Regions:
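Short, glycine/acidic-enriched loop or turn micro-motifs at the edges of active sites
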Residues: 6, 10, 124, 154
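Glycine-rich, proline-tolerant flexible connector loops at the mouths of alpha/beta enzymes
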Residues: 3-31, 84-91
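Glycine-rich, phosphate-binding/catalytic loops in enzymes
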Residues: 19-20, 136-137, 165-166
């Protein structure tokens, strides 16, 4: 299957606002290719972090998350991945972790309402760089619609960088 990505550029973020005709065009291409879109990565949530101290950025993050889940429903995507960052551009603090958890709980409610699985993508940062750390948040949220989507590449990359630099 294919994966769709909602990157942090305005052009890619605008995908979540597709009209019906644009969605139909994608579905026709998917049908013709015989290759469904099985997952969606919402990496725009690095720029617009769920735990950002700035309330406006958090609001934008939640809009992106909700519209991404709604788009997933329309396109038949089963899993939406969100990055395991409380904040990407800034310092992780008790406050950013609190905001992150609050917003992930809201996302889990949206996912349940829409019938879409959301998975934490494990990342290369200390916040959620292991499945064990991701499990802690999954347990705190306690939703059947929030899971883990481990990305082995994010575990290997730091090791490769060490090897290349030595």
């Amino acid at each position: 299957y294919m994966e769709m990505c909602i990157d942090a550029t305005d052009e890619k973020i605008n995908r979540i606002f597709m009209n019906t005709a644009e969605k139909k065009e994608i579905m026709e291409a998917v049908f013709q290719a015989g290759l469904p879109i099985g997952s969606m990565s919402v990496s725009a949530l690095t720029k617009y972090a769920l735990g950002d101290p700035d309330e406006e950025i958090r609001k934008k993050a939640m809009q992106i998350a909700e519209k991404s889940i709604e788009l997933a429903v329309d396109l038949g995507v089963r899993t939406v991945m969100i990055p395991g960052y409380d904040i990407y551009f800034g310092e992780s603090t008790i406050e950013t972790k609190k905001y992150f958890l609050e917003n992930v709980k809201k996302i889990a409610e949206i996912a349940e309402r829409e019938g879409i699985l959301v998975g934490f993508e494990t990342m290369e940062n200390n916040f959620m760089n292991t499945t064990g750390k991701a499990v802690q948040y999954v347990n705190m949220v306690d939703s059947a619609y929030l899971k883990i989507y481990p990305d082995a590449g994010n575990r290997v990359t730091p090791l490769l960088q060490l090897r290349i630099s030595s």
